[in-house]
Regions:
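Compositionally biased terminal segments of proteins
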Residues: 1-130
Length: 130
């Protein structure tokens, strides 16, 4: 269900805002491994300008899809116990040393999104543990 919710929002981001989001966190790892990991939420990375000066565009997409903003600081929304949070894709560079220009794009039913490779997930989880 979470993957379907991500794809629904990713499609909206692709079409309305020309954003290719990065499926991040446990749900992204679940997708990369093709293994169920019981991801608790949906974490998505997008260009930083959409977390700042263009934030209202994201809010509009989420509200139009039945989500309510519940944590502005974390850029987090909720719908039917599904938490959907945004962060900056550019933060991967200083945080984990990931070259965002080399992240592969997945095209699933004409919905485009970035998905980290396993070695990049290792960099993220290593950086998170420090």
């Amino acid at each position: 269900m979470k993957k379907e919710e991500f794809l629904l929002i990713a499609k909206e981001l692709n079409i309305k805002l020309n954003i290719v989001p990065l499926l991040f966190g446990s749900l992204g790892l679940e997708q990369r491994l093709d293994m169920y990991l019981d991801a608790e939420d949906i974490d998505v990375l997008i260009p930083e300008k959409f977390l700042n000066e263009k934030w209202q565009y994201i809010v509009n997409v989420m509200v139009d899809n039945g989500y309510a903003l519940y944590d502005l600081h974390e850029h987090a929304f909720i719908k039917n116990d599904i938490s959907f949070a945004y962060a900056s894709i550019e933060s991967l560079i200083p945080f984990a040393g990931i070259d965002i220009s080399k992240i592969p794009i997945i095209n699933e039913n004409d919905i485009r999104y970035f998905l980290l490779e396993l070695q990049d997930y290792l960099k993220v989880y290593t950086a998170s543990s420090k």
